[in-house]
Protein backbone atom coordinates (compact mmCIF):
# COMPACT_ATOMS: atom_id res chain seq x y z
CA UNK A 1 0.00 0.00 0.00
CA UNK A 2 2.95 2.32 0.56
CA UNK A 3 4.24 1.88 -2.96
CA UNK A 4 1.38 3.71 -4.57
CA UNK A 5 1.69 6.99 -2.56
CA UNK A 6 5.46 6.97 -3.11
CA UNK A 7 5.04 6.59 -6.81
CA UNK A 8 2.64 9.47 -6.98
CA UNK A 9 5.00 11.65 -5.04
CA UNK A 10 7.87 10.93 -7.34
CA UNK A 11 5.80 11.73 -10.37
CA UNK A 12 4.75 15.05 -9.01
CA UNK A 13 8.31 16.10 -8.38
CA UNK A 14 9.43 15.36 -12.03
CA UNK A 15 9.13 17.97 -14.77
CA UNK A 16 6.19 17.56 -17.16
CA UNK A 17 8.40 17.01 -20.22
CA UNK A 18 10.34 14.30 -18.62
CA UNK A 19 7.14 12.96 -17.24
CA UNK A 20 5.82 12.33 -20.74
CA UNK A 21 9.00 10.54 -21.66
CA UNK A 22 8.88 8.61 -18.46
CA UNK A 23 5.30 7.64 -19.15
CA UNK A 24 6.23 6.37 -22.63
CA UNK A 25 9.18 4.37 -21.33
CA UNK A 26 7.22 3.14 -18.41
CA UNK A 27 4.31 2.05 -20.50
CA UNK A 28 6.69 0.18 -22.80
CA UNK A 29 8.37 -1.58 -19.95
CA UNK A 30 5.14 -2.35 -18.16
CA UNK A 31 3.77 -3.77 -21.35
CA UNK A 32 6.79 -6.05 -21.55
CA UNK A 33 6.29 -7.28 -18.05
CA UNK A 34 3.28 -5.98 -16.12
CA UNK A 35 4.31 -7.66 -12.93
CA UNK A 36 7.73 -6.00 -12.64
CA UNK A 37 6.51 -3.18 -10.36
CA UNK A 38 3.18 -4.30 -9.09
CA UNK A 39 2.77 -7.92 -8.43
CA UNK A 40 -0.12 -8.03 -5.93
CA UNK A 41 -3.10 -6.29 -7.38
CA UNK A 42 -4.16 -4.65 -10.58
CA UNK A 43 -3.46 -0.96 -10.89
CA UNK A 44 -6.07 1.50 -9.93
CA UNK A 45 -6.59 4.92 -11.34
CA UNK A 46 -3.18 6.21 -10.11
CA UNK A 47 -0.05 6.76 -12.31
CA UNK A 48 2.54 4.02 -12.60
CA UNK A 49 5.64 4.29 -10.51
CA UNK A 50 9.25 4.53 -11.72
CA UNK A 51 11.11 1.55 -12.96
CA UNK A 52 12.58 -0.59 -10.34
CA UNK A 53 16.11 -1.87 -10.45
CA UNK A 54 16.89 -4.69 -12.75
CA UNK A 55 16.57 -8.04 -11.21
CA UNK A 56 19.32 -10.55 -11.09
CA UNK A 57 20.16 -12.43 -14.28
CA UNK A 58 18.02 -15.46 -14.64
CA UNK A 59 19.34 -18.95 -15.35
CA UNK A 60 20.85 -19.55 -18.78
CA UNK A 61 18.31 -20.92 -21.18
CA UNK A 62 18.77 -23.95 -23.41
CA UNK A 63 20.84 -23.55 -26.52
CA UNK A 64 18.64 -22.51 -29.39
CA UNK A 65 18.56 -24.11 -32.82
CA UNK A 66 21.38 -23.00 -35.15
CA UNK A 67 20.44 -20.09 -37.30
CA UNK A 68 20.57 -20.17 -41.08
CA UNK A 69 24.12 -19.68 -42.44
CA UNK A 70 25.03 -16.16 -43.34
CA UNK A 71 26.41 -15.20 -46.75
CA UNK A 72 29.98 -16.31 -47.49
CA UNK A 73 32.51 -13.64 -46.74
CA UNK A 74 35.14 -12.50 -49.24
CA UNK A 75 38.26 -14.65 -49.56
CA UNK A 76 41.04 -13.49 -47.34
CA UNK A 77 44.65 -12.89 -48.42
CA UNK A 78 46.57 -16.12 -49.10
CA UNK A 79 48.61 -17.23 -46.19
CA UNK A 80 52.32 -18.03 -46.36
CA UNK A 81 53.28 -21.24 -48.16
CA UNK A 82 53.46 -24.19 -45.85
CA UNK A 83 56.34 -26.66 -45.77
CA UNK A 84 56.65 -29.02 -48.74
CA UNK A 85 54.67 -32.13 -48.04
CA UNK A 86 55.73 -35.68 -48.74
CA UNK A 87 55.61 -36.79 -52.34
CA UNK A 88 52.25 -38.29 -53.11
CA UNK A 89 51.63 -41.45 -55.05
CA UNK A 90 51.73 -41.20 -58.80
CA UNK A 91 48.33 -40.43 -60.21
CA UNK A 92 46.83 -42.34 -63.07
CA UNK A 93 48.21 -41.48 -66.48
CA UNK A 94 46.34 -38.64 -68.08
CA UNK A 95 45.27 -38.53 -71.69
CA UNK A 96 48.10 -37.67 -74.08
CA UNK A 97 48.32 -33.97 -74.70
CA UNK A 98 48.50 -32.41 -78.18
CA UNK A 99 51.74 -32.87 -80.08
CA UNK A 100 54.18 -30.09 -79.27
CA UNK A 101 56.13 -28.08 -81.83
CA UNK A 102 59.25 -29.62 -83.24
CA UNK A 103 62.22 -28.68 -81.10
CA UNK A 104 65.48 -27.29 -82.51
CA UNK A 105 67.75 -29.92 -84.06
CA UNK A 106 70.14 -31.50 -81.64
CA UNK A 107 73.91 -31.55 -82.12
CA UNK A 108 75.14 -34.01 -84.75
CA UNK A 109 75.75 -37.47 -83.39
CA UNK A 110 78.90 -39.50 -83.76
CA UNK A 111 79.39 -40.81 -87.31
CA UNK A 112 78.04 -44.29 -87.71
CA UNK A 113 80.02 -47.18 -89.13
CA UNK A 114 80.64 -47.10 -92.85
CA UNK A 115 77.84 -48.76 -94.77
CA UNK A 116 78.31 -51.26 -97.53
CA UNK A 117 79.40 -49.83 -100.83
CA UNK A 118 76.37 -49.04 -102.91
CA UNK A 119 76.01 -49.64 -106.63
CA UNK A 120 77.77 -47.28 -108.97
CA UNK A 121 75.65 -44.21 -109.62
CA UNK A 122 75.03 -42.71 -113.02
CA UNK A 123 77.99 -40.66 -114.11
CA UNK A 124 77.48 -36.92 -114.02
CA UNK A 125 78.30 -34.49 -116.79
CA UNK A 126 81.89 -33.53 -117.37
CA UNK A 127 83.07 -30.74 -115.08
CA UNK A 128 85.27 -27.82 -116.18
CA UNK A 129 88.99 -28.57 -116.44
CA UNK A 130 90.88 -27.85 -113.26
CA UNK A 131 93.69 -25.34 -112.99
CA UNK A 132 97.18 -26.76 -113.65
CA UNK A 133 98.87 -27.90 -110.49
CA UNK A 134 102.16 -26.42 -109.26
CA UNK A 135 105.37 -27.62 -110.82
CA UNK A 136 106.65 -30.73 -109.09
CA UNK A 137 109.95 -30.98 -107.31
CA UNK A 138 113.02 -32.01 -109.27
CA UNK A 139 113.32 -35.76 -109.28
CA UNK A 140 116.34 -37.61 -107.94
CA UNK A 141 119.42 -37.82 -110.10
CA UNK A 142 119.29 -40.76 -112.46
CA UNK A 143 121.81 -43.55 -112.48
CA UNK A 144 124.73 -43.75 -114.83
CA UNK A 145 123.50 -44.52 -118.31
CA UNK A 146 124.85 -47.11 -120.71
CA UNK A 147 128.18 -46.28 -122.40
CA UNK A 148 127.75 -44.06 -125.43
CA UNK A 149 128.93 -44.80 -128.93
CA UNK A 150 132.60 -44.29 -129.72
CA UNK A 151 133.40 -40.74 -130.65
CA UNK A 152 134.86 -39.78 -134.01
CA UNK A 153 138.70 -39.82 -134.19
CA UNK A 154 140.38 -36.59 -133.22
CA UNK A 155 142.47 -34.50 -135.65
CA UNK A 156 146.02 -35.62 -136.50
CA UNK A 157 148.71 -34.58 -134.08
CA UNK A 158 151.54 -32.15 -134.95
CA UNK A 159 154.30 -33.42 -137.25
CA UNK A 160 157.17 -34.88 -135.30
CA UNK A 161 160.82 -33.72 -135.62
CA UNK A 162 162.97 -34.96 -138.47
CA UNK A 163 164.75 -38.18 -137.70
CA UNK A 164 168.57 -38.66 -137.79
CA UNK A 165 170.18 -38.89 -141.27
CA UNK A 166 170.58 -42.35 -142.66
CA UNK A 167 173.95 -44.02 -143.50
CA UNK A 168 175.83 -42.85 -146.64
CA UNK A 169 174.92 -44.72 -149.75
CA UNK A 170 177.40 -46.78 -151.88
CA UNK A 171 179.67 -44.85 -154.27
CA UNK A 172 178.26 -44.28 -157.69
CA UNK A 173 179.79 -45.72 -160.94
CA UNK A 174 182.78 -44.04 -162.43
CA UNK A 175 182.04 -41.82 -165.34
CA UNK A 176 183.58 -42.38 -168.80
CA UNK A 177 187.09 -41.11 -169.00
CA UNK A 178 187.35 -37.79 -170.73
CA UNK A 179 190.01 -36.80 -173.22
CA UNK A 180 193.19 -35.83 -171.70
CA UNK A 181 193.26 -32.21 -171.52
CA UNK A 182 194.74 -29.53 -169.56
CA UNK A 183 193.76 -29.58 -166.11
CA UNK A 184 190.74 -27.54 -166.16
CA UNK A 185 188.49 -26.45 -163.43
CA UNK A 186 186.61 -29.09 -161.58
CA UNK A 187 183.76 -30.45 -163.56
CA UNK A 188 180.17 -30.70 -162.45
CA UNK A 189 179.09 -33.48 -160.17
CA UNK A 190 178.20 -36.74 -161.78
CA UNK A 191 174.75 -38.20 -161.93
CA UNK A 192 173.29 -39.26 -158.61
CA UNK A 193 173.86 -42.82 -157.77
CA UNK A 194 171.06 -45.27 -156.87
CA UNK A 195 169.42 -44.86 -153.41
CA UNK A 196 171.23 -46.48 -150.60
CA UNK A 197 169.76 -49.05 -148.21
CA UNK A 198 166.93 -47.96 -145.83
CA UNK A 199 168.30 -46.32 -142.79
CA UNK A 200 167.36 -47.16 -139.21
CA UNK A 201 164.09 -45.76 -137.81
CA UNK A 202 164.48 -42.37 -136.31
CA UNK A 203 163.48 -41.52 -132.76
CA UNK A 204 159.67 -40.89 -132.22
CA UNK A 205 158.54 -37.34 -132.55
CA UNK A 206 156.88 -35.43 -129.71
CA UNK A 207 153.24 -36.35 -128.78
CA UNK A 208 150.73 -34.24 -130.61
CA UNK A 209 148.06 -32.13 -128.85
CA UNK A 210 145.04 -34.07 -127.50
CA UNK A 211 142.11 -34.11 -129.86
CA UNK A 212 138.55 -33.23 -128.80
CA UNK A 213 136.91 -36.10 -126.90
CA UNK A 214 133.79 -37.76 -128.26
CA UNK A 215 132.42 -37.99 -124.63
CA UNK A 216 131.23 -34.38 -124.73
CA UNK A 217 128.97 -35.17 -127.65
CA UNK A 218 127.63 -38.22 -125.80
CA UNK A 219 126.88 -36.15 -122.70
CA UNK A 220 125.12 -33.52 -124.79
CA UNK A 221 123.10 -36.25 -126.48
CA UNK A 222 122.17 -37.75 -123.12
CA UNK A 223 121.05 -34.35 -121.87
CA UNK A 224 118.84 -33.86 -124.90
CA UNK A 225 117.37 -37.34 -124.47
CA UNK A 226 116.64 -36.58 -120.80
CA UNK A 227 114.83 -33.38 -121.76
CA UNK A 228 112.81 -35.21 -124.39
CA UNK A 229 111.90 -37.95 -121.90
CA UNK A 230 110.64 -35.33 -119.43
CA UNK A 231 108.57 -33.65 -122.11
CA UNK A 232 107.20 -37.01 -123.21
CA UNK A 233 106.24 -37.91 -119.63
CA UNK A 234 104.44 -34.59 -119.15
CA UNK A 235 102.68 -35.07 -122.47
CA UNK A 236 101.60 -38.58 -121.46
CA UNK A 237 100.28 -37.31 -118.11
CA UNK A 238 98.39 -34.48 -119.78
CA UNK A 239 96.95 -36.84 -122.38
CA UNK A 240 95.90 -39.28 -119.66
CA UNK A 241 94.07 -36.52 -117.79
CA UNK A 242 92.52 -35.24 -121.02
CA UNK A 243 91.38 -38.75 -121.93
CA UNK A 244 89.79 -39.23 -118.51
CA UNK A 245 87.99 -35.90 -118.84
CA UNK A 246 86.78 -36.73 -122.33
CA UNK A 247 85.52 -40.15 -121.21
CA UNK A 248 83.64 -38.75 -118.21
CA UNK A 249 80.79 -39.53 -117.81
CA UNK A 250 79.84 -41.57 -120.88
CA UNK A 251 83.09 -43.26 -121.85
CA UNK A 252 85.43 -46.05 -120.78
CA UNK A 253 89.04 -46.85 -121.64
CA UNK A 254 90.48 -50.38 -121.80
CA UNK A 255 94.05 -50.75 -122.98
CA UNK A 256 94.33 -48.80 -126.23
CA UNK A 257 90.57 -48.92 -126.86
CA UNK A 258 88.06 -46.22 -125.98
CA UNK A 259 84.31 -46.86 -125.79
CA UNK A 260 82.00 -43.83 -125.76
CA UNK A 261 78.26 -43.20 -126.06
CA UNK A 262 76.09 -40.11 -126.39
CA UNK A 263 72.98 -41.96 -125.18
CA UNK A 264 71.10 -42.06 -128.50
CA UNK A 265 69.34 -45.15 -129.89
CA UNK A 266 69.55 -46.12 -133.56
CA UNK A 267 69.15 -49.13 -135.85
CA UNK A 268 72.24 -51.26 -136.51
CA UNK A 269 72.90 -49.63 -139.89
CA UNK A 270 72.43 -46.07 -138.58
CA UNK A 271 74.62 -46.83 -135.56
CA UNK A 272 77.37 -48.11 -137.88
CA UNK A 273 77.17 -44.90 -139.91
CA UNK A 274 77.35 -42.66 -136.82
CA UNK A 275 80.46 -44.43 -135.50
CA UNK A 276 82.16 -44.43 -138.92
CA UNK A 277 81.57 -40.68 -139.35
CA UNK A 278 83.09 -40.13 -135.89
CA UNK A 279 86.22 -42.07 -136.89
CA UNK A 280 85.36 -45.28 -135.03
CA UNK A 281 83.20 -48.37 -135.34
CA UNK A 282 80.64 -50.33 -133.36
CA UNK A 283 82.29 -52.09 -130.39
CA UNK A 284 83.99 -55.46 -130.90
CA UNK A 285 84.77 -56.76 -127.39
CA UNK A 286 87.64 -59.27 -127.57
CA UNK A 287 88.15 -59.81 -123.82
CA UNK A 288 86.27 -59.89 -120.54
CA UNK A 289 87.76 -56.49 -119.61
CA UNK A 290 86.42 -54.86 -122.78
CA UNK A 291 83.05 -56.54 -122.25
CA UNK A 292 82.95 -55.19 -118.68
CA UNK A 293 83.60 -51.63 -119.92
CA UNK A 294 80.67 -51.93 -122.34
CA UNK A 295 78.52 -53.39 -119.54
CA UNK A 296 79.18 -50.32 -117.38
CA UNK A 297 78.05 -47.98 -120.17
CA UNK A 298 74.91 -50.03 -120.84
CA UNK A 299 74.14 -50.13 -117.10
CA UNK A 300 74.59 -46.36 -116.76
CA UNK A 301 72.09 -45.79 -119.59
CA UNK A 302 69.91 -48.78 -118.56
CA UNK A 303 69.71 -49.80 -122.22
CA UNK A 304 70.89 -52.66 -124.41
CA UNK A 305 73.49 -51.66 -127.04
CA UNK A 306 74.46 -52.97 -130.47
CA UNK A 307 77.82 -54.74 -130.99
CA UNK A 308 79.62 -54.89 -134.34
CA UNK A 309 79.31 -58.65 -134.98
CA UNK A 310 76.72 -60.26 -137.29
CA UNK A 311 75.96 -63.54 -139.11
CA UNK A 312 74.66 -62.05 -142.34
CA UNK A 313 77.30 -63.92 -144.40
CA UNK A 314 76.58 -67.32 -142.89
CA UNK A 315 73.64 -68.04 -140.61
CA UNK A 316 74.74 -69.01 -137.11
CA UNK A 317 78.38 -67.96 -137.64
CA UNK A 318 79.00 -64.54 -136.11
CA UNK A 319 82.10 -62.68 -137.27
CA UNK A 320 83.75 -59.29 -136.78
CA UNK A 321 83.39 -56.62 -139.50
CA UNK A 322 86.89 -57.64 -140.68
CA UNK A 323 85.65 -61.17 -141.39
CA UNK A 324 87.54 -62.72 -138.46
CA UNK A 325 85.78 -65.31 -136.29
CA UNK A 326 84.97 -64.41 -132.69
CA UNK A 327 87.82 -64.76 -130.18
CA UNK A 328 85.57 -63.96 -127.20
CA UNK A 329 81.85 -64.28 -126.51
CA UNK A 330 79.45 -63.93 -123.59
CA UNK A 331 76.13 -65.26 -124.87
CA UNK A 332 73.11 -65.45 -122.60
CA UNK A 333 71.81 -69.00 -121.94
CA UNK A 334 70.30 -70.63 -125.06
CA UNK A 335 71.56 -67.81 -127.26
CA UNK A 336 71.96 -67.18 -130.15
CA UNK A 337 68.70 -68.81 -131.24
CA UNK A 338 67.74 -66.75 -134.35
CA UNK A 339 64.23 -66.32 -132.97
CA UNK A 340 61.88 -65.60 -135.86
CA UNK A 341 64.60 -66.37 -138.40
CA UNK A 342 65.81 -62.77 -138.75
CA UNK A 343 68.08 -62.11 -135.75
CA UNK A 344 71.38 -61.38 -137.48
CA UNK A 345 72.84 -58.69 -135.17
CA UNK A 346 74.16 -58.81 -131.59
CA UNK A 347 73.16 -56.72 -128.57
CA UNK A 348 74.72 -56.54 -125.10
CA UNK A 349 72.40 -56.33 -122.08
CA UNK A 350 73.11 -54.14 -119.01
CA UNK A 351 74.15 -57.37 -117.24
CA UNK A 352 76.87 -57.97 -119.87
CA UNK A 353 75.23 -60.95 -121.60
CA UNK A 354 74.84 -61.12 -125.40
CA UNK A 355 71.74 -61.84 -127.46
CA UNK A 356 71.12 -62.07 -131.20
CA UNK A 357 68.71 -59.35 -132.30
CA UNK A 358 66.85 -58.03 -135.34
CA UNK A 359 69.08 -55.40 -136.96
CA UNK A 360 66.17 -53.06 -137.71
CA UNK A 361 65.32 -52.44 -134.06
CA UNK A 362 66.79 -49.46 -132.21
CA UNK A 363 69.43 -49.94 -129.56
CA UNK A 364 71.93 -47.76 -127.66
CA UNK A 365 74.80 -46.52 -129.84
CA UNK A 366 78.29 -47.12 -128.39
CA UNK A 367 81.31 -46.42 -130.59
CA UNK A 368 84.78 -47.95 -130.31
CA UNK A 369 87.87 -45.86 -131.03
Curated annotation (Swiss-Prot):
The modification 4-hydroxyproline is found at residues 78, 96, 165, 171. The modification 5-hydroxylysine is found at residues 87, 99. Residues 1-20 form the signal peptide. It comes from the Eukaryota. It holds the Pfam family Lectin_C. The keyword Calcium applies. It is found in: Secreted, Extracellular space, Extracellular matrix; Secreted, Extracellular space, Surface film. One of its GO terms (molecular function) is carbohydrate binding. PROSITE patterns: C_TYPE_LECTIN_1 (PS00615), C_TYPE_LECTIN_2 (PS50041). Residues 47-65, 198-210 have a biased composition (Basic and acidic residues). SMART domains: CLECT. The modification S-nitrosocysteine is found at residues 35, 40. One of its GO terms (biological process) is respiratory gaseous exchange by respiratory system. Its main location: secreted. Residues 254-369 form the C-type lectin domain. Keywords: Calcium, Coiled coil, Collagen, Disulfide bond, Extracellular matrix, Gaseous exchange, Glycoprotein, Hydroxylation, Immunity, Innate immunity, Lectin, Repeat, S-nitrosylation, Secreted, Signal, Surface film. Residues 217-248 form a coiled coil. Glycans are attached at residue 90. Residues 46-216 form the Collagen-like domain. Pulmonary surfactant consists of 90% lipid and 10% protein. There are 4 surfactant-associated proteins: 2 collagenous, carbohydrate-binding glycoproteins (SP-A and SP-D) and 2 small hydrophobic proteins (SP-B and SP-C). Oligomeric complex of 4 set of homotrimers. Contributes to the lung's defense against inhaled microorganisms, organic antigens and toxins. Interacts with compounds such as bacterial lipopolysaccharides, oligosaccharides and fatty acids and modulates leukocyte action in immune response. May participate in the extracellular reorganization or turnover of pulmonary surfactant. Binds strongly maltose residues and to a lesser extent other alpha-glucosyl moieties. Belongs to the SFTPD family. This is Pulmonary surfactant-associated protein D. It comes from Bos taurus.
Amino acid sequence: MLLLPLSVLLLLTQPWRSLGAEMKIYSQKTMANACTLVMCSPPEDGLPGRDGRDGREGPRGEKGDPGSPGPAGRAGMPGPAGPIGLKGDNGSAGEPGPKGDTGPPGPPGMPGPAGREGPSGKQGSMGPPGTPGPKGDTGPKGGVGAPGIQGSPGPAGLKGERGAPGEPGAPGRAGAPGPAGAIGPQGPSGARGPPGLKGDRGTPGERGAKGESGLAEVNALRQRVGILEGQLQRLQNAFSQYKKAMLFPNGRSVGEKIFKTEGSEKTFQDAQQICTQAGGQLPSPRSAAENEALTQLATAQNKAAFLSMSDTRKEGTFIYPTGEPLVYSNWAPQEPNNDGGSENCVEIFPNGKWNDKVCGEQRLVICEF
